[in-house]
A protein has these predicted regions:
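Hydrophobic alpha-helical segments
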Residues: 1-78, 85-170, 187, 243-248, ...
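Short beta-strand elements
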Residues: 172-205, 339-354
Length: 354
C-alpha cells in the first residue's frame, strides 16, 4: 500500500491522557510488551495494552495546522488489498512519531491525498527521512506514524512536508488546500522522559469485543464521525460490513450539490468510537423499478458537516429505490492492535429507500 491519504487530530496538551479507561487498566512500572492475543475476533477488540504519548509541538503550514507527538515504538499492521502484515518493533527503534493535520477555521480533520513525509535532523544533519504510514489506533484515531531510530538524546528538528488534498471538497473547502506546505517542530529527546510515559495493560479484557476510548482532546479537533441524527440530509440506512458501521444519507444542501440533484453520502466508521475509515474504494448502484439510475464509483470527499466520507451526485433518490454499496477495496490504512483484524473482508450493503 502507499503511505498516504489521511491525517487525524490530536491534543495540544503536553501529556495526553486516556479518557474513561483507568478502571480497566493496570499500570506497569516497567514496559514489557505483551504477546499478541492468539484468538482474535475478525472484529474490533480490546488490545493487550495501550501506551501514553506526548505532544512535541505544533506549527502552521499554509492552510493546515500540524501537530506532532511521540510515544514508545509500536507494533502495527500494514494492509495491502485484503492482506495484513505485522510490522514488529526493531531493536534500533527509539520512538513512534505521529503527525496530525486539521483545519483551524472549521475544526475539521483533513485528508492529505498526496501524502506526508518526515525529515528528522540534528545539528543540521539528516538523521532519518521517510514517509510515515497512514494509521488508525483506538486511542488516537487517524494519524500518520512510524517507528524511528534516533542518534541518542538531544535536540532534533522534525520537518513535515504535506502534499495537496486530492479528494473532493464540496462546500466551504472548495478551492482550499490546493498547495503543498511544510512546517518544522523542534524536539528535545530524553530516554527518561520517554520511559516516563504511561504504559498500561488489559489483564482481563484483552481480545474481547470492544475498544479503548479515544484520547481527551483539549485544543484540537477529534477525528470522530457525526452521529446519524447530526449528519446532513435524510438518513437512509445504518448497516454493518466487516465490523464497520455505515451511515448513509441523501443530501440536497446546495453546498453538496451545486444546486441540483441529490448527494449520496456514505460515512463508514469504526464501532464504539466512530472513527472515520479512510482509503477505501466504494462503488454504488441505484435502481428504480428495475431500471438503473446510477452505477459508478463514490468519490473520497471531506466536508465540515460530515468529515471524511464517500459520495456521489445523483439526479435524485426516491422511496422504493434499491441501493447497493459495494466495498471494492477495504481501508488501505495501517492499524494498531485491536483494529488489524477488522474492516478487511467486507460484504456489499443493500437496502431499499423507505
Amino acid at each position: 500500500m502507499q503511505r498516504r491519504e489521511f491525517l487525524a487530530s490530536t491534543s495540544l496538551a503536553g501529556a495526553v491522557a486516556i479518557a474513561g479507561c483507568n478502571s480497566l487498566f493496570e499500570t506497569e512500572s516497567v514496559r514489557s510488551v505483551p504477546d499478541v492475543v492468539e484468538d482474535r475476533p475478525d472484529a474490533v477488540y480490546f488490545p493487550t495494552h495501550v501506551e501514553g504519548m506526548e505532544m512535541i509541538g505544533m506549527t502552521a503550514a499554509g492552510d493546515y495546522t500540524i501537530g506532532l507527538m511521540y510515544s514508545f515504538p509500536h507494533r502495527f499492521w500494514t494492509v495491502t488489498g485484503t492482506t495484513t502484515e505485522k510490522v514488529s518493533i526493531r531493536d534500533k527503534d527509539d520512538i513512534h512519531l505521529m503527525a496530525s493535520v486539521w483545519d483551524d477555521e472549521t475544526g475539521t480533520v483533513l485528508p492529505v491525498g498526496s501524502g506526508l513525509s518526515m525529515t528528522v535532523e540534528q545539528d543540521g544533519e539528516v538523521v532519518t527521512e521517510k514517509p510515515p504510514w497512514p494509521m488508525i489506533s483506538q486511542n488516537m484515531g487517524f494519524h500518520y506514524g512510524d517507528n524511528f531510530a534516533l542518534d541518542g538524546e538531544g535536540t532534533y528538528d522534525v520537518t513535515l512536508d504535506i502534499g495537496s488534498m486530492n479528494v473532493s471538497k464540496p462546500g466551504p473547502f472548495e478551492g482550499r488546500f490546493e498547495e503543498s506546505a511544510s512546517g518544522t517542530v523542534e524536539f528535545e529527546y530524553s530516554v527518561d522522559e520517554r520511559d516516563g510515559l504511561r504504559f498500561e495493560t488489559f489483564e482481563n479484557q484483552q481480545g474481547e469485543r470492544g475498544a479503548v476510548d479515544l484520547m481527551e482532546m483539549e485544543m484540537a479537533p477529534v477525528s470522530v464521525a457525526p452521529e446519524p441524527d447530526a449528519m446532513p440530509g435524510d438518513h437512509l440506512t445504518e448497516a454493518t460490513s466487516g465490523d464497520a458501521v455505515f451511515q448513509v444519507t441523501a443530501v440536497r444542501d446546495p453546498s453538496f450539490t451545486d444546486g441540483s440533484g441529490t448527494y449520496l453520502a456514505v460515512s463508514p466508521r469504526t464501532p464504539f468510537n466512530r472513527v472515520p475509515l479512510p482509503m477505501m474504494s466504494l462503488s454504488g448502484t441505484v435502481e428504480r423499478g428495475g431500471e438503473p439510475r446510477f452505477d459508478g464509483a463514490l468519490s473520497k470527499a471531506v466536508h465540515p458537516d460530515i468529515g471524511y466520507h464517500y459520495g456521489a451526485l445523483l439526479d435524485g433518490i426516491e422511496s422504493d429505490d434499491a441501493v447497493t454499496i459495494t466495498v471494492d477495496t477495504p481501508p488501505q490504512v495501517s492499524r494498531h492492535e485491536g483494529y488489524e483484524t477488522a474492516f478487511v473482508e467486507m460484504d456489499p450493503i443493500e437496502f431499499t429507500v423507505s
